[in-house]
């Protein structure tokens, strides 16, 4: 009987982030937004009606409008979006730290796709792939759709790798400690203590929460646990929670970040903003918060505005992910 050699017996870790256009031109942005906004997990609407609205109204307007915003934040030195740049570096650093695992990354929307990276990992000999969605707080619009895509890809494979998943880490001790330390380090750099630290999370239609999405609860717990870590050391700082990036006419989770910042201007408060729901800086942090919200805050008479960068590809982020993975699956040393 003919013998076949089998060299495949490796483990891999696949970091997954949201996604990005390939470039900041209208065509690239339109292609990315179409894939993103066509996901029924993201937009829960009548599919026929939504397809008409998306293709005839939203895509032509938003793609053109977003050229300037993407161009503003684009990493022109590497010709990549910040999200792609930081996620790629993060995976590379984690790969160097984990000798017994292949570490790679994918984007849920855009490139590199989950499908292409699962194929690549299999070609490298991976028979077990650990999926790590880089969303601390679970939502059907983020974490769930990652697994939807993973299993869609698996359904087409003759030889399916074993799949394991890392749990949402919104209340993980390593995550809470890392975010808390990040805030402390930022506060030390300031000339004066701010009146408020605002935790700004990406918003979600309230209807999704009413249907059972736990996202709000996860955001609130992250906020509460970090607040408990810091409030004794900073008794004169108010810690508050808000939600940004509202899209469409429906009611979203409140309070809205824009509204909270307007309140702070009227109260003559200085504010430090952190966006702990984002693993890497992106359009929502670098343009929406750092530029648009800050300009509006200052224009309306706000006192001082400071934004804490996301964890990005920092060593603290690498160590945090390493510890979370080790806690979940007991890494081979």
Curated annotation (Swiss-Prot):
A Pfam family matched in the record: Ferrochelatase
Alphabetical list of InterPro entries matching this protein: Ferrochelatase, Ferrochelatase_AS, Ferrochelatase_C, Ferrochelatase_N
Example of a GO cellular component annotation carried by this entry: cytoplasm
Compartment list: Cytoplasm
Positions bound to Fe cation: 202, 284
EC primary class: lyase
One example GO MF annotation: ferrochelatase activity
Catalytic activity: heme b + 2 H(+) = protoporphyrin IX + Fe(2+)
GO biological processes: heme biosynthetic process
Protein EC: 4.98.1.1
Keywords recorded for this protein, A-Z: Cytoplasm, Heme biosynthesis, Iron, Lyase, Metal-binding, Porphyrin biosynthesis
Source species, domain of life: Bacteria
Pathway: Porphyrin-containing compound metabolism; protoheme biosynthesis; protoheme from protoporphyrin-IX: step 1/1
Role: Catalyzes the ferrous insertion into protoporphyrin IX.
Stated family: Belongs to the ferrochelatase family.
Protein's UniProt name: Ferrochelatase
Organism annotation: Francisella tularensis subsp. tularensis (strain SCHU S4 / Schu 4)
């Amino acid at each position: 009987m003919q013998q076949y050699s089998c060299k495949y017996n490796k483990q891999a870790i696949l970091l997954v982030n949201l996604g990005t256009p390939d470039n900041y031109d209208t065509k690239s942005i339109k292609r990315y937004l179409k894939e993103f906004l066509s996901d029924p997990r993201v937009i829960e609407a009548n599919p026929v009606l939504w397809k008409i609205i998306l293709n005839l109204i939203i895509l032509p307007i938003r793609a053109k409008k977003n050229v300037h915003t993407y161009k503003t934040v684009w990493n022109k030195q590497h010709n990549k979006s910040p999200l792609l740049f930081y996620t790629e570096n993060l995976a590379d650093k984690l790969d160097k730290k984990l000798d017994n695992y292949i570490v790679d990354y994918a984007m849920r929307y855009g490139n590199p796709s989950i499908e292409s990276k699962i194929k690549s990992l299999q070609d490298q000999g991976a028979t077990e792939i650990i999926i790590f969605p880089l969303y601390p707080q679970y939502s059907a619009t983020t974490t769930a759709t990652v697994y939807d895509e993973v299993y869609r890809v698996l359904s087409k494979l003759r030889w399916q790798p074993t799949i394991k998943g890392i749990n949402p880490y919104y209340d993980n001790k390593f995550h809470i400690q890392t975010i808390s330390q990040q805030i402390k380090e930022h506060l030390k750099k300031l000339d004066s203590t701010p009146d408020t630290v605002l935790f700004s999370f990406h918003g979600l239609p309230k209807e999704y929460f009413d249907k059972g999405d736990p996202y709000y609860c996860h955001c609130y717990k992250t906020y509460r646990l970090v607040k408990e870590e810091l409030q004794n050391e900073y008794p004169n700082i108010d810690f508050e929670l808000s939600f940004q990036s509202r899209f469409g006419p429906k009611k979203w989770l409140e309070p809205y970040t824009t509204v909270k910042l307007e309140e702070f201007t009227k109260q003559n408060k200085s504010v430090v903003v952190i966006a702990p729901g984002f693993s890497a800086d992106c359009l929502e942090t670098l343009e929406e918060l750092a530029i648009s919200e800050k300009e509006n805050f200052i224009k309306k008479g706000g006192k001082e505005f400071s934004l804490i960068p996301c964890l990005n590809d920092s060593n603290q982020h690498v160590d945090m992910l390493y510890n979370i993975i080790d806690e979940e699956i007991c890494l081979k040393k």
